[in-house]
Amino acid sequence: MRTFRNCSHPLLAAAMLFASMAAFAAELPLGPMPISLKYLPVPPVPGLADGSDPIVVNKPAAIALGKALFWDSNVGSDGMACASCHFQAGADGRSKNQISAGGQSKPVAEQIFADSSDATPLGPNRTLSLADFPLHQRLDPLADSAVVFDTDNVVGSAGTFAGEFKGVNRFTSGTDICNRAADPVFRVGANGTRRVTPRNAPTVINAVFNHRSFWDGRANNVFNGSSPWGDRDPDAGVWVKTGPRNVQKQRLHLINSSLASLAVAPPANHTEMSCSNRSLLDVGRKLLYRAPLQNQLVHHADSVLGPYSNSNPEKLNPGLNLPYGSLVRQAFNAKYWSYSGSVPLAVPAGQAPYTQLEANFPMFFALAIQLYESTLISDQAPFDNSARDANHQPVDLSAAELNGLKQFRKNQCALCHLGPNFSSASIAANAAIAQSHPEAFGEPTFRISASSNVVNRIPLLVGGLPVTAFYDTGFSSNGASREANDIGAGSVDDFGNPLSFSLQYLQLLAGNSAAVQDSEVNAVRACDFQDAVATNLKLPYSLPNLFTQIDGLMPQPQSTANCFLPLVNAFLPTPAAAAAELNKAVNRKMVAAVTATFKTPSLRNIELTGPYMHNGSMATLEQVVEFYSRGGNFKNDSKHVTRVFPQPTLQTDAQNRADLVAFLKTLTDDRVRYQRAPFDHPELKIPHGHSGDEVATVAGNPLNASLSKDEYLRLSAVGAEGAAEPLPAFEQRLAP
């Protein structure tokens, strides 16, 4: 629902919002007009490949390294590549053995596989069918009607068998030495199956625009060289050669690098890719001395890897023509790999000390993958390529698609799926074009704040009370699942600190600056909130949702240039006023709505990236539109009820719903659909369930006799010109 920039009284604004929610039949103003992705700048990473002493000295070599690492099944302990969960338009389109028993926040004791809506086992090794979706079903899918089926099970991504890591082979075997056995949760009878993640795998295409990565934002905007946690990790750093006989561990601080922060996590995760207790240093020891993609065909016309391939027009061959270590040396500054001695790091018993090349492998791996993924920008969809009229309408779309765009703007979709990437999580990129393309963020009478603020404020209902709550920019709760199943950005990092920027910001306002873990929280400007936190108007009374002079105010410490709100709102509560409000039994001014909030995904290529939502609970775009038409599934406290509520123009008009889906399909880039450069790739053999079904599997996996035999989905090597056949949508991959 809308907030109005010219309305300085928060109670009036809230009244307008909640009244208009009730008046469903009323005509709503249109939201922001999306624009082409061609206008969106990639957020810069100072110091990565620029300046007098860059980290990357050969960017094309680094991109080649990143692409090889992303697609190489030797990265995993038992055949999982990064691409194994991101092969279908950057997402995961598998349909067998994709079910996890409960969300990310479910205790192990409560992780129980349910039955499907037809009472058959919805568990390990099931082949999903269209009838299994959605995972929450209503008697009338367009209305807040009786629930006829619900499960907390998640459609995630099948990964590894796990097991206790023991060692690697440096040259030949792609599987690690691990003590493996049947998993206590992921099994069919006595036979172990591959584990499945408790969240759906989002696309990596256009992910370079995200300020943070992962659904919960735990992949920090700052890359520290060795972990996902940015400046939060006190032990992070990289090894730098400072002299012929000296190497020193130094801190690294690369902004706009959440893709690098993300990249270091899956290869060490014992559900996604790894045996337990394996580090990225072990992965480096395994890979650096062998050829990239040594068991996978590489197309001679691959847009990146072609010059390094062993293939020719007559025959495709596996691997590249140089080892990983050589690519690293070509791509990265010598001070990160040229030290000839060992680094002072603890090593497992009986193993040789780590070289500098091995010790810095997490940095090489992460930055190379980030640079590769930064090339995966799909800005040539029909929506992008259309001419525009004076009102910025894409005139080359059909009448149905244009009506779908109107429905997209009218039914609150554009408030979260904002800007050229259709995501408010693209913070820096959206802020960079807010002045040059204001139409992307609303009309003069109603506009969405598109600043560099990582915290924002909107009216919500929390605990039944109307409040103006803080939330993390680019994160929201739409009520897709119960709050207890997965608390999303309301969780904490490995050190016990909140992931949420909003929770840190509350502590900052209350005078506890030591609680701030992420430096961008200190830069949040009060005058750039969607709805104000304070007003400096001389009012003779206090307000329930807004700090006033009576409470105690101080000017915001940052500049007031180009503020979104009037300058009377460029104020903050004093620390004493903020702390007093936090300590109240009923707090309405210092509320953070972050529990069960998740990163707003891009809608680009959305027809190819199902299943949908963080829990993979919907198979088709039609099911997604039904979900939003009825206003979601659950009424969580952090739910954005002023944006997700029943939409009468969709509930009552099947043509509007069909047209909205038609518009969403104009966001598909045919280069993605046909796997053309830069979306071409090597061959990949992807684990896709096991021999048998959800009732019985065939044991005798070569890794361990107690494990089920793998089945595979084989992806052929594709060159720059792409494939002859288009990628199918997720529902087309499902069983009848």
Describe each PLM feature range:
Residues 2-12:
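Bacterial N-terminal signal peptides that target proteins for export
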